[in-house]
Amino acid sequence: LQERLNAEVVLTRTDDTFISLEERTALANEHQADVFVSIHANSSRIRSVSGVETYYLNFATTLDAQEVAARENVSTGRNIRELPDLVKSITKADKSAESRELANILQKRLYRSAQRLFPETKNRGVRTAPFVVLIGADMPSVLAEVGFVSNPRDEKLLKRVDSRKRLAEALYAGIEGYMKSLGSMEVQASNRAKGSAP
């Protein structure tokens, strides 16, 4: 991203040091980031569950999404019902729509890349859930689940340097695709404002 898009990249951490979910979002806001991508490896009680999925902030629409959010949010020590800022941040409709767009583009790239690594990779799609790490973000924000560490095949792939590099390239391509889509959206909005057809 830094080299190819001349973008400033801010990592919330570069090692295994724990940084709270809220601090990660605050750091992105402090740096006035254009996008916030939280990268995770998923887990399931059912070891056969595998694949890639991307989330953006909203209420969970499936039991799976609720369970993933509950696991990811456990480090906060709070229950989702105890997060008063959740409803307020979800009502930022413009960020929700932008986050959905980012999630869709990122998911397509992630799935394509993961499928090249392992053709049987499941596309678990774009989902919504109330992730603490996404609450309060002032920019489009998503959580990308790049595989399941509870699945032996996914775990094996995630341990390989070449696999992680490919997934990183897919994340780059997704962010690049999203940034390019912003340009076309701005042109369309400008044309609509001028009264001309897009």
Give each language-model segment a name.
Residues 1-198:
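Active-site-proximal helix/loop segments of hydrolytic enzymes
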